[in-house]
Amino acid sequence: MRRMRFSPRSSFARTLLLIVTLLFVSLVTTYLVVLNFAILPSLQQFNKVLAYEVRMLMTDKLQLEDGTQLVVPPAFRREIYRELGISLYTNEAAEEAGLRWAQHYEFLSHQMAQQLGGPTEVRVEVNKSSPVVWLKTWLSPNIWVRVPLTEIHQGDFSPLFRYTLAIMLLAIGGAWLFIRIQNRPLVDLEHAALQVGKGIIPPPLREYGASEVRSVTRAFNHMAAGVKQLADDRTLLMAGVSHDLRTPLTRIRLATEMMGEEDGYLAESINKDIEECNAIIEQFIDYLRTGQEMPMEMADLNSVLGEVIAAESGYEREINTALQAGSIQVKMHPLSIKRAVANMVVNAARYGNGWIKVSSGTESHRAWFQVEDDGPGIKPEQRKHLFQPFVRGDSARSTSGTGLGLAIVQRIIDNHNGMLEIGTSERGGLSIRAWLPVPVARVQGTTKEA
């Protein structure tokens, strides 16, 4: 069972996640600092002032600074009530006036109890206009004091929320844009590296971005230039070797033409060896040629397979077909696909016992073609090495050849962004299926067998 990954894989996502996390931590830290050093001290001061007001309203006498006791007339107390908007309610009346919707705050009750010197309950009612504070003190346990905070409005906090949200969105958007700009050279490097992996040397990349990225880009350009020079030298070397080898082979062929009839069997054997040498040279050149960039075009896969089948039929070969009815339009390089199919058919003819089957189809927006034989097959542990250059399977399939035929097929399919699958044919031999994961114009129909 695969373990689930919760961390992002790409550097873009990781950097963006880091910036968002730091921004969130910064906002939380700012909130805690403002809460502890601004809001809570202000709230304590508010509670202290409110406690003084309640104490003055709940007692008949006030003690002045010089110790004098001052009696508060009822009319003066009512005037203070009116100016401050304070009203008194019994328990039942308070419930009807909104106490039932108020929420109890323990820390406010604790602070108010310290200021008033006895048990105090504080509740806060939040309505559409302004919050309301409800108090019940030990000075008058059956009376609720309603204090509206008229200077505080619910709309006062909306701009703060909008500004905070706007700052967060701007910070995240800026971080996303910054990281995208920083990662753009890396994306170019990735695409270029994939092309080099397919044997296609891209033009030199533009050196931009951070100094470290420019250094990597510069090193990559040097490496790509070196790989291109090496490939050009290899191609030139093989072209020269093939030319130099074909010259004496041609002279040998001319010499066999001058041999007498009594040496006809010897001349025929020499000509077969010459043809085999020419075939080996052609395979080397084909292997080098498949690494070059190929122009793609839309073509019918069944038509390409049909041309190869027509060309390879005969020569004591029985080629059966099971092609999907209709046209399978695939973006490909037709000549290269023909070469791949021909190599697969030749491989099946060389190692099989005369029976060959070529089939095609579409599945999950991918096209495929398959070549099967009735030979001894390949052991499963050896199949992964079959497409490597100069590998010809196990000893049961050891015959003449360079071992480049299927390696050429692998490079051609790789250049088409495809993949190869090896299996067992319906007659116990080898089955090779090539997938072309490109847009396919699929038609309705059945498979045609011949």
From Swiss-Prot:
Q: Describe PTMs of this protein.
A: Autophosphorylated.
Q: What this chain does, per the record?
A: Member of the two-component regulatory system EnvZ/OmpR involved in osmoregulation (particularly of genes ompF and ompC) as well as other genes. EnvZ functions as a membrane-associated protein kinase that phosphorylates OmpR in response to environmental signals; at low osmolarity OmpR activates ompF transcription, while at high osmolarity it represses ompF and activates ompC transcription.
Record topology, Periplasmic segments: 36-158
UniProt keyword list: ATP-binding, Cell inner membrane, Cell membrane, Kinase, Membrane, Nucleotide-binding, Phosphoprotein, Stress response, Transferase, Transmembrane, Transmembrane helix, Two-component regulatory system
Tell me which PROSITE patterns the record gives.
HAMP, HIS_KIN
Which comment does the entry carry about domains?
Has several major domains; the N-terminal cytoplasmic domain is followed by 2 transmembrane helices that anchor the protein in the membrane; the periplasmic domain between the helices interacts with MrzA. The cytoplasmic C-terminal domain has a HAMP domain joined by a flexible linker to a histidine kinase domain. The HAMP domain by itself is intrinsically disordered. The cytoplasmic dimerization domain (CDD) forms an osmosensitive core and includes the autophosphorylated histidine residue.
Q: Where in the cell is it found?
A: Cell inner membrane
Coiled-coil parts of chain: none
Q: For side Cytoplasmic, which residue ranges?
A: 1-15, 180-450
Catalytic activity field: ATP + protein L-histidine = ADP + protein N-phospho-L-histidine
User: Where is the stretch described as Cytoplasmic dimerization domain (CDD), when dimerized forms osmosensitive core?
Assistant: 223-289
Domain (HAMP) ranges: 180-232
The entry's cellular-component GO terms read: plasma membrane
Q: Which organism is it from?
A: Salmonella typhimurium (strain LT2 / SGSC1412 / ATCC 700720)
Designated gene of the protein: envZ
Its EC number is 2.7.13.3
Q: How does it assemble?
A: Homodimer.
Q: How is the protein disposed in the membrane?
A: Multi-pass membrane protein
Phenotype when the gene is knocked out: Double knockout with ompR leads to decreased expression of genes encoding virulence proteins. Double knockout with ompR decreases virulence in mouse.
Give the binding site residues for ATP.
H243, N347, A348, A349, R350, Y351, D373, R392, G393, T402, G403, L404, G405, L406
Q: What is this protein called?
A: Sensor histidine kinase EnvZ
Domain annotation Histidine kinase: ranges: 240-440
Mind telling me which residue stretches traverse the membrane in this protein? 16-35, 159-179
For molecular function, the Gene Ontology terms on record are: ATP binding; phosphorelay sensor kinase activity
* Residues where Phosphohistidine is found: H243
